């Protein structure tokens, strides 16, 4: 029986992780969970899965839940609560399904407690990848990717040495506006941006998909997870989201991982690795019915956030911290109706242009830069 700590239980990845746990009650137990402010859903999850430790965002919510459930469950809150869930002694693996750089400290806490980490929180690797990877190596902790693209690469690599790999090819659906010209993007609405053609995701990642920043963040994530240079990581538009990513080897063999677009598949693989469990209810891929798969080159001028991500990644240091923080603030402001869709990339570009990067930042320096950028852009 594998004990699981889940960070971000009420979000898209979190609820789909619970679907997997629900499907395999003899294999998985939810020992601890952390969520934000969705108290109603959290309450239902506690009743169903009966974790021993729960953390919420606000102290008053922790007090409310403690009054309802009594002493059989420990309730915590805030940043310390997140870290406690991440390093909970009874857990074997931690799923970091929380969105944003708030996931950094609990991820490091899980690693230092020598917990296996199923990482779905790409912002942590973007803002502080060198610290996370270094800590994982130091503590001999596996970082198992949950994102469909990185799970695909993880499977396609299958233990091959790095010297055998020529390049990684991440696929991208193109997002909500893949068929619109750049001129047509000027007046798009929040509702239009949230209508993703293939995947069911949270609001932030859906907007990131529309700007193509999500794929940019995934390029940086891939660099840290697999230890390759940016020149070895390419992106290809693939509208059907059937090929989740590919690895091209030095002998020009290309190995791809295919499947219908359902996040529960890579989530399950991260939880069961190195084993595979059957999913009899899952839709089987029928290539004959699909008939054709389509691919397009990535247009860096149309999708400028992708270009910014590569530039920040190559610059290194705190440039990716700025990229991530500026993007989080800009997306939040767009969702609140404060800025237009195309202003997201402008805000990010201006923040990057104004920043003097620190080459090898400490955790404290990353936190300071992150806080400074957020304060500037929220003003």
Curated annotation (Swiss-Prot):
Residue numbers binding 1-deoxy-D-xylulose 5-phosphate: 122, 148-149, 173, 196, 209, 214-215, 218
Listed EC numbers: 1.1.1.267
The UniProt record lists the keyword Protein biosynthesis: no
Keywords: Isoprene biosynthesis, Manganese, Metal-binding, NADP, Oxidoreductase
Catalytic activity: 2-C-methyl-D-erythritol 4-phosphate + NADP(+) = 1-deoxy-D-xylulose 5-phosphate + NADPH + H(+)
Highest taxon listed in the record's lineage: Bacteria
Pathway assigned to this chain's UniProt record: Isoprenoid biosynthesis; isopentenyl diphosphate biosynthesis via DXP pathway; isopentenyl diphosphate from 1-deoxy-D-xylulose 5-phosphate: step 1/6
Residues the entry annotates as binding NADPH: 10-13, 36, 38, 121, 123, 202
GO biological process per UniProt: isopentenyl diphosphate biosynthetic process, methylerythritol 4-phosphate pathway involved in terpenoid biosynthetic process
Family: Belongs to the DXR family.
Function: Catalyzes the NADPH-dependent rearrangement and reduction of 1-deoxy-D-xylulose-5-phosphate (DXP) to 2-C-methyl-D-erythritol 4-phosphate (MEP).
Protein name stated in the entry: 1-deoxy-D-xylulose 5-phosphate reductoisomerase
